[in-house]
A protein has these predicted regions:
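Short glycine-enriched loops at secondary-structure junctions
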Residues: 1, 22-24, 111-116
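Conserved H-X4-D acyltransferase segment
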Residues: 1-16
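A short secondary-structure junction signal
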Residues: 4-8, 28-32, 77-80
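Membrane-interfacial amphipathic helices and adjacent loop/beta segments
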Residues: 17-48
């Protein structure tokens, strides 16, 4: 929710958006959009994310776009595995791919709570170089997940454990890949 409220706190010449997956129920989707857009932010449907970010860049519009990757990718969306909390874990790579395509600077923000309704978000640069200049062996995605793990260990009450990051195993994924190639 903090991404949706950023326009309330920062300069009006900076657009703020968050990536979201439209809900199947149109009434709930409308309600969700109304609540998330009430402070002036923009909900960007996942399927049009790259197009919208390219449009913002083309028009030289400064923007902060929130990518949240707290869930497990579907089988057909798994393109990368990384070590996360001592387990091989499938992860989304959209932030890295889009960041490279549009020359974006990418930050990571920890979510912690000082007291009721106060959530300081210390933003940290993941890499000092734009992501496209990072050596191949140093994937942005692999730099991001250890930070989440550290934050989860320090503040487990803020992580959505219900999302079950490990419901998809690498062995099952490899088996499915082999079946598809037959």
């Amino acid at each position: 929710e903090w991404i949706a409220s950023l326009p309330y706190w920062i300069s009006k010449d900076i657009s703020c958006g968050q990536i979201y997956h439209p809900l199947y129920n149109q009434a709930f989707d409308k309600l969700f959009l109304r609540l998330r857009n009430q402070f002036g932010g923009e909900c960007i449907p996942m399927k049009t994310t790259l197009r919208r970010i390219i449009e913002l860049k083309r028009t030289k519009q400064k923007a902060i776009i929130g990518f949240i990757s707290d869930q497990a990718p579907k089988w057909n969306s798994i393109h990368h595995w990384t070590e996360f909390l001592n387990q091989e874990t499938p992860v989304f790579i959209g932030t890295e791919k889009i960041g490279k395509q549009v020359d974006a600077l990418i930050y990571y923000a920890d979510v912690t709570r000082v007291k009721r309704r106060i959530l300081p978000l210390p933003a940290q640069t993941i890499v000092r170089h734009p992501p496209w200049q990072v050596p191949r062996f140093l994937k942005l995605t692999d730099l991001f997940h250890p930070r989440i793990g550290t934050n989860n260990k320090a503040h487990p009450q803020y992580w959505l454990w219900s999302h079950n990051r490990w419901k998809r195993t690498k062995e099952e994924w490899l088996r499915r890949q082999q079946e598809e190639t037959k």
